[in-house]
A protein has these predicted regions:
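A conserved structural motif in NAD(P)-dependent oxidoreductases
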Residues: 228-239, 250
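Canonical Rossmann dinucleotide-binding motif of NAD(H)/NADP(H)-dependent dehydrogenases/reductases
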Residues: 1-30
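Catalytic loop of short-chain dehydrogenase/reductase
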Residues: 88-92, 119-193, 205
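Short, small/polar-rich loop/turn modules that mediate ligand/substrate recognition or access, typified
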Residues: 197, 254-256
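Short, flexible catalytic-loop segment of classical short-chain dehydrogenase/reductase
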Residues: 203-213
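Rossmann-fold cofactor-recognition segment
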Residues: 46-64
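Conserved glycine-rich Rossmann-like NAD(P)H-binding loop of the short-chain dehydrogenase/reductase
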Residues: 25-41
Length: 277
């Protein structure tokens, strides 16, 4: 049976790097992206290198689109590897859209893919270091709301428990990514019964078009690079290498955890030191 890898957000940045990292492993790469031009260009680039890659246009906030994607994947063969890199950052949208894409869309996608997960299948979902930078423990009442993202009134409940603060895109992004990390904990229990695995990955400051946009608009992003002990941004291929490992047989006992790949900036901030000292 055809061994299939599916990568969301595959048109550029870390998603494209993940597709390239999985190219030699899979018989077929399904490159899912909202941007048809990006997905098609990525498929052509990989195809020129001898990889069978097919673009698939999907918006993770669209239930019908996700249903079409899962139907397509089921018809292609055995879905062995999933890298869900699609998402948006604080400068790209209002708070409701950020949560809808980054958390609700992720929850909806994982729910739809669950029946396709068989023994040995593995998934990596992109979260972020953002919630790990918050020095304050999260409110348990907020976490209780956060853990039920598919409720029809989820956004209103989140606004009620967090207050007006969540309307700041950066705050909304951090909470959405915290929700992704916690979603993976629960999904690991469900998938484990089928012999499948799932982890999240939390990148730090990475040199991508999206990351550069954030850095241009927020000086705090540039400050985080300066505090990174390794003294630089990460590269998309460095994130993809970790994703590739987490999806491999070498990581067959890795399940339900978050992989922080940030050059040490969270460690430096928790230690209360300048990362370059």
């Amino acid at each position: 049976m055809t061994a299939v890898a599916m990568i969301t957000g595959a048109g550029r940045g870390m998603g494209l790097a993940c597709a390239e990292a999985l190219a030699e492993r899979a018989d077929l790469l399904v490159l899912a992206d909202r941007d048809e031009t990006g997905a098609t260009a990525a498929a052509a680039r990989l195809g020129a290198a001898g990889t069978r890659a097919e673009p698939f246009v999907v918006d993770v906030t669209d239930p019908a689109g996700i249903a079409d994607l899962t139907g397509y994947l089921a018809a292609q063969g055995d879905l062995r590897w999933v890298a869900h890199a699609a998402g948006i950052s604080p400068t790209m949208a209002d708070w409701r859209t950020i949560v809808n894409v980054d958390l609700i869309g992720t929850a909806r996608l994982l729910e739809a893919l669950r029946p396709l997960a068989g023994p040995g299948a593995a998934t990596v979902v992109f979260a972020s270091m953002a919630p790990l930078l918050d020095p304050n423990p999260p409110d348990p009442a907020a976490l209780a709301v956060l853990d039920d993202p598919l409720r029809t009134d989820f956004l209103d409940r989140l606004r009620n428990v967090l207050g007006a603060e969540v309307e700041q895109p950066g705050i909304a992004y951090s909470w959405a990514k915290r929700g992704v990390q916690r979603l993976v904990w629960r999904e690991a229990v469900r998938l484990g019964a089928a012999g499948a695995r799932i982890c999240s990955i939390s990148p730090g400051m990475i040199d991508t078009p999206q990351g550069r946009q954030e850095a241009r608009e927020h000086t705090s992003m540039r400050a985080l690079v300066e505090r990174t002990p390794l003294g630089r941004e990460g590269r998309p291929e460095e994130i993809a290498a970790v994703v590739g490992f987490a999806l491999s047989e070498a990581a067959s006992f890795l399940n339900g955890t978050d992989l922080l790949v940030d050059g040490g900036v969270v460690a430096a901030m928790r230690a209360g030191v300048d990362g370059r000292r």
